[in-house]
C-alpha cells in the first residue's frame, strides 16, 4: 500500500501468524503501507531451538522497524504480543508512533515467573519424542477447534474455519522446532512485568476489546490504572479476534485512532 507505515503483529497462541490480519490488511493498504510480520518461531518465520524470551521478540520487532520499515511506525498488535510492543517502545520510543492493542493480556499474568513446575514442564516439552507428542496433542485438529469454540469465537457455532485451518497448519510447520515457542510461553519464560514500561511510555495507546473477551473489562481497567492516557473501545459481538469477526467495525476504530 501507500501512505504512513502500519505494522501488524499477531497473537502468540499456538499456531499464531500474520494470517489473522487477512480480513483487514487490504483495506488498510488503501491508506497505509502495511507490514504484516510473522514473529520468530511463528507462522512462516524460521523455527529454531533457541529460548524464546520477551527480549528476543522486543529485539526482532525493533530490528524489523529499523531495517525493513526504516521510519517511525504505527502498530496494531493482538493479545500476548502486546507485552513485546510495550517493552520495545519503552526501550526505543523513537521507532514507534501510535499503538493499538487488541485484547491485551492481563498485567498480573505477565508478572508470573517460571517456578519449579514450569521449569519441569519446559524440560518435558524439550524431550525429543515425548515433548513433540505432547505438543501435537495440544495442537491437534480437535484441540485447535475446541480452543476457538471455548475461548476465541464470539459465536461458538460459527468460528472462522479459515483461521482455524491457518492456526492448525502454522502450528505444525517447522518440524521438531515447531513446539519451541509453545514450550517457552507455556512455561512462562516469555513473561515479563510490563507495568513500568506501560507507565513510562507517552505514545498514544488505544485498546480494542472484544465484548465477550475473558476478563476484558478488568484488564482494560488495570491498563488505565497504570497509564491513565490509555483509551479503550469495545466491539460488540466479538471475542478474541474482533478484526476477524467484525472487520468493518474494527477498521472504523482504526480510522478514528490513526
Each predicted region: which residue ranges?
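Conserved loop-alpha-helix segment in the C-terminal half of the alpha/beta-hydrolase fold
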Residues: 200-238
Amino acid at each position: 500500500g501507500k501512505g504512513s507505515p502500519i505494522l501488524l503483529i499477531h497473537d502468540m497462541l499456538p499456531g499464531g501468524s500474520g494470517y489473522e490480519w487477512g480480513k483487514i490488511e487490504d483495506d488498510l493498504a488503501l491508506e497505509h503501507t502495511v507490514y504484516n510480520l510473522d514473529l520468530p518461531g511463528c507462522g512462516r518465520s524460521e523455527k529454531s531451538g533457541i529460548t524464546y524470551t520477551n527480549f528476543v521478540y522486543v529485539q526482532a520487532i525493533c530490528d524489523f522497524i529499523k531495517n525493513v520499515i526504516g521510519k517511525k511506525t504505527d502498530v496494531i498488535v493482538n493479545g500476548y504480543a502486546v507485552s513485546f510492543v510495550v517493552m520495545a517502545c519503552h526501550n526505543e520510543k523513537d521507532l514507534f508512533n501510535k499503538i493499538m492493542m487488541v485484547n491485551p493480556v492481563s498485567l498480573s499474568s505477565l508478572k508470573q515467573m517460571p517456578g519449579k513446575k514450569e521449569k519441569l514442564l519446559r524440560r518435558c516439552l524439550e524431550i525429543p519424542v515425548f515433548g513433540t507428542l505432547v505438543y501435537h496433542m495440544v495442537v491437534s485438529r480437535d484441540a485447535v477447534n475446541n480452543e476457538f469454540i471455548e475461548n476465541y469465537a464470539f459465536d461458538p457455532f460459527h468460528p472462522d474455519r479459515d483461521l482455524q485451518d491457518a492456526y492448525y497448519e502454522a502450528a505444525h510447520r517447522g518440524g521438531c522446532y515447531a513446539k519451541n515457542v509453545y514450550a517457552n510461553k507455556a512455561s512462562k519464560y516469555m513473561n515479563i512485568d510490563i507495568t513500568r514500561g506501560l507507565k513510562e511510555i507517552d505514545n498514544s495507546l488505544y485498546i480494542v476489546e472484544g465484548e465477550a473477551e475473558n476478563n476484558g473489562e478488568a484488564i482494560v481497567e488495570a491498563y488505565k490504572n497504570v497509564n491513565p492516557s490509555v483509551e479503550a473501545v469495545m466491539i460488540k459481538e466479538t471475542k478474541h479476534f474482533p478484526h476477524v469477526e467484525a472487520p468493518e467495525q474494527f477498521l472504523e476504530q482504526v480510522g478514528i485512532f490513526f
